[in-house]
């Protein structure tokens, strides 16, 4: 059931005034009766599951006249003062979101960029992370301002055929990401067991313990967030330890961050660095995670304060992720840049190469790498399953218990992942598989980015929280850049892989259908069609 605009609720009230109507019409579309709506519509979090953040309850413009003076004085004085306690209460969703910037696919992109390009692509890693932050802030804005997540909003925004296509694309992206994440964790288990546990056994262990970790949510969202904090800290300590042990050249590091440099030899690695940053499922995930705090989207001051703290938290989280990615890139740049091994390094054999290059030390670097990779694989697998719950529930409006949705989501990925583990148990095979999975992720990016920008730009959806024209221009520019970069990756990949007339013809048909759907999403989300129609009418009038 689509929610009624807040303006409609205000009009229905006999006590409402014209001023009240105007104030309500500027607020986002939210359910008029949350209890009734919860019976009909799937929700990211039930009211009893949400964390109380004690946002200052300043009256809004629609309160009675006696309190309106206080509202005016509060508005005049600005947002309530910053509170470290409130920031702590809001901390969690941003760090869960940042896991997608640290998954095994990103780590493989980091190590290959370091081995092939040295420190020269660190500036691109910084800017790619900044672009990723912009996209994730938009996702958080949608979730907080509307009280609904992106999959739910897409269900109401698009016709049935389009939303089914979007759901299918999101699920395909989810399965592809999940295979990478579970395989990464399984590789780590194989390393830490010294080869005793084969890849398929690591896959089964990862799939099972994912349910154990997710069950912690039954004891409160904060318990699950604490687990992720431990996993991120484990990654940070492991890769910082590697960074310290290998003693990279700090001058080259800072030059790499500050001085843009790109050669034809490193274009593929550059595209990989950018392509790993935007994970389609992560956009859906973040828009749902921010609803874990008790915020009334009908209260403008509560939304503004929540967005303030979420922005700070997300920035800190992605700054941490940038440092971890930097550690991995510089370690492999130090050890393998300019060597004959540079083109052969992948997740499966990276630990062995590190061991041969840097030796044992106090604690063998092979196991340090394995621990960091295990933390990355476990955390990203859990968030992937979490995202799958929201995607399926939002698009299909399934009122199922969370453990059932987790089981369904996990089932989509576990069978193909076990097959992959059985047939791709060698480094070369895993590298080929990873290339195909990266292509799969790249194909899906427009189907998360375009709906997000479309919805966050609509006053009917966002009310006063819709982004302005300048921000729209920036976001569409970033989206175009990301889609173009990933398009280059697709062109480069398919031009080397596709052979023969039949396969080429099939690819052309697929590209035409793909481009048509992307164009449909863009035109539906902009004013361009209306402008064209207006221009045509004027020319014939």
Curated annotation (Swiss-Prot):
Record keywords: Ion transport, Iron, Iron transport, Membrane, Transmembrane, Transmembrane helix, Transport
Annotated function: Probable metal transporter.
Biological process terms in GO annotation: iron ion transmembrane transport; manganese ion transport
Record-level Gene Ontology MF annotations: cadmium ion transmembrane transporter activity; manganese ion transmembrane transporter activity
Organism: Oryza sativa subsp. japonica (Rice)
Keyword DNA repair tagged: no
Membrane topology summary: Multi-pass membrane protein
Membrane-crossing segments per the record: 87-107, 120-140, 172-192, 196-216, 224-244, 270-290, 316-336, 358-378, 404-424, 436-456, 474-494, 502-522
PANTHER family: METAL TRANSPORTER NRAMP2 (PTHR11706:SF104), SOLUTE CARRIER PROTEIN FAMILY 11 MEMBER (PTHR11706)
Protein's name in the database: Metal transporter Nramp6
Cellular component GO terms, alphabetical: membrane; trans-Golgi network
Annotated region described as Disordered, given as residue ranges: 1-44
Localisation: Membrane
Family the UniProt entry places it in: Belongs to the NRAMP (TC 2.A.55) family.
Start-end of Low complexity biased regions: 1-18
Record-linked InterPro entries: NRAMP_fam (IPR001046)
Primary localization class, coarse: membrane
């Amino acid at each position: 059931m689509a929610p009624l605009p807040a303006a409609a609720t205000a009009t229905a009230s006999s006590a409402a005034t014209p001023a009240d109507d105007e104030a309500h019409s500027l607020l986002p579309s939210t359910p008029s009766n949350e209890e009734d709506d919860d019976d009909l519509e799937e929700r990211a979090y039930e009211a009893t599951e949400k964390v109380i953040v004690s946002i200052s309850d300043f009256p809004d413009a629609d309160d009675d006249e006696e309190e309106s003076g206080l509202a005016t004085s509060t508005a005049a004085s600005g947002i309530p003062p910053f509170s470290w306690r409130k920031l702590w209460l809001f901390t969690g969703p941003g760090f869960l979101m940042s896991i997608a910037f640290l998954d095994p696919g990103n780590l493989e992109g980091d190590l290959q960029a370091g081995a092939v390009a040295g420190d020269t692509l660190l500036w691109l890693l910084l800017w790619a992370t900044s672009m990723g932050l912009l996209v994730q802030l938009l996702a958080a804005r949608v979730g907080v301002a509307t009280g609904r997540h992106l999959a739910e909003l897409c269900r109401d925004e698009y016709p049935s055929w389009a939303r089914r296509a979007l759901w299918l694309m999101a699920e395909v992206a989810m399965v592809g990401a999940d295979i990478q994440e579970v395989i990464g964790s399984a590789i780590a288990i194989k390393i830490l067991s010294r080869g005793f546990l084969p890849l398929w056994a690591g896959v089964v262990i990862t799939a099972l313990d994912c349910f154990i970790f997710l069950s912690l949510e039954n004891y409160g969202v904060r318990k699950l967030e604490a687990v992720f904090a431990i996993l991120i800290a484990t990654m940070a300590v492991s890769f910082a330890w590697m960074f310290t042990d290998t003693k990279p050249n700090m001058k080259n590091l800072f030059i790499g961050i500050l001085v843009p440099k790109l050669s034809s030899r490193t274009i593929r690695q550059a595209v990989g660095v950018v392509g790993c940053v935007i994970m389609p499922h992560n956009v859906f995930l973040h828009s749902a995670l921010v609803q874990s705090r008790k915020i009334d989207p009908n209260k403008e001051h509560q939304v503004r304060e929540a967005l303030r703290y979420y922005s700070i938290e997300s920035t800190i989280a992605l700054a941490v992720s940038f440092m971890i990615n930097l550690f991995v890139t510089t370690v492999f740049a130090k050890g393998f840049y300019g060597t004959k091994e540079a083109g052969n390094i992948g997740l499966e054999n990276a630990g062995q190469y590190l061991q041969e290059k840097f030796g044992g030390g106090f604690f063998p670097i092979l196991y340090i790498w394995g621990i960091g990779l295990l933390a990355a694989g476990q955390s990203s697998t859990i968030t992937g399953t979490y995202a799958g719950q929201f995607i399926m529930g939002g698009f299909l409006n399934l009122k199922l218990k969370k453990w059932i949705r987790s089981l369904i989501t996990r089932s989509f990925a576990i069978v193909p992942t076990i097959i992959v583990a059985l047939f791709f148990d060698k480094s070369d095979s895993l590298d080929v598989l990873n290339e195909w999975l990266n292509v799969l992720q790249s194909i899906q990016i427009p189907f998360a980015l375009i709906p997000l920008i479309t919805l966050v730009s609509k006053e009917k959806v966002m009310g006063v929280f819709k982004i302005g024209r300048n921000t729209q221009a920036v976001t569409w520019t970033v989206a175009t850049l990301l889609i173009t970069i990933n398009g280059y990756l697709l062109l480069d990949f398919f031009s080397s892989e596709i052979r023969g007339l039949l396969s080429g013809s099939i690819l052309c048909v697929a590209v035409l259908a793909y481009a048509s759907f992307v164009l449909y999403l863009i035109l539906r989300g902009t004013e361009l069609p209306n402008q064209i129609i207006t221009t045509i009418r004027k020319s014939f009038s």
